[in-house]
Amino acid sequence: MAEVACQTVGWRFATVEDREVITAMVADAAEQASLRLTPPELATSPAKFRRPDGTSVFRPKHSTVFSSDSLLAAEDHLLQRARTATGPTIDLTTVGTITSKADSEGRVLGPDQAAALASVAVPGRVVDVLVGPAGAGKTAAMNAPRRAWETEHGAGSVVGLAPSAVAAQVLADDLRIATENTAKWWTTHQHTGVTFKAGQLVIIDEASLAETLSLNRITLAAEEAGTKVLLVGDYAQLPSVDAGGAFSLLIHDRHDAPELVDVHRFTHAWEKTASLELRHGRTPVIDTYLAQDRIHDGDAEAVTAAAYTAWRHDRQQGLSLI
């Protein structure tokens, strides 16, 4: 209903009632054309346990899940590509060299980053994944396959994509590769025919934010070109605003999906552990943040003022800030 209301907000109706009727009709038509994934209620709840609209109070409101033939087909295609080992690979000797040597900034790969490189570079999956929690050295982990690919396939053999222009620019700055946002790349591909090259590695950052149909289209183009796609992200972070979930689907389809586990961002050891606990939704970690005086309360005005004061102080000190 919310999506229908959004799509019809510019339409004019004689009365509010007319708008509500049309909204309901469009929503009903969309429901009829969709595939219902949530099973129906097999038992009727007593009247005192039913809402005014007749639904059971034992089932959350608006919790029915729908899909479509095209979306399910896209998921199947992505799973198949993730199980297909016909993509370009890197020699194990090159992987060993990259693992043992520091990069241009003097960074040496940690054990989890080195394992991730071997998992991504050697098997030859057409679509591969890398899970990188916040602060776990994702940039260094992505830089490793870039170095390996350019060693064997030459300059320009690694390109980047991301669901947003901002994320694409960050990826370009971090890895020093050509990048584009996924929507722009697909539009250019449709109008000009420009596509990937055989042997390339395509890194799609913030992959949990990418919609499933978009990933399916891009990975199909990559498969046809003889290119490997590496999806990098964190399934525990924000999902796509469109029909998404493909990244999480691919992660949980494997028992050996590479995941970075060593958090580098924080100075204090307790905060490294706590950030991962919070990521997994383990509520007891809130006590840790309370004990470390990291949780403060107040009304909206007081909290806003405190945040601004802290921001201004850090800025005056020349510190990095949001």
Where are these regions (language model features)?
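Conserved RecA-like ASCE P-loop NTPase motor core of nucleic-acid helicases/translocases
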Residues: 128-172, 229-232, 260, 294-297, ...
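Substrate-engagement module of ASCE P-loop NTPases
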Residues: 222-231, 235
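Conserved helicase motor core of P-loop NTPases
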Residues: 77, 86, 115-116, 232-322
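Conserved P-loop NTPase motor core of helicases/translocases
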Residues: 151-221, 249-252, 261-297
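Short loop/turn elements that form and flank the Walker-type P-loop nucleotide-binding site
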Residues: 123-124, 155, 196-198, 223-226, ...
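Conserved Walker B
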Residues: 134, 206-210, 235-236
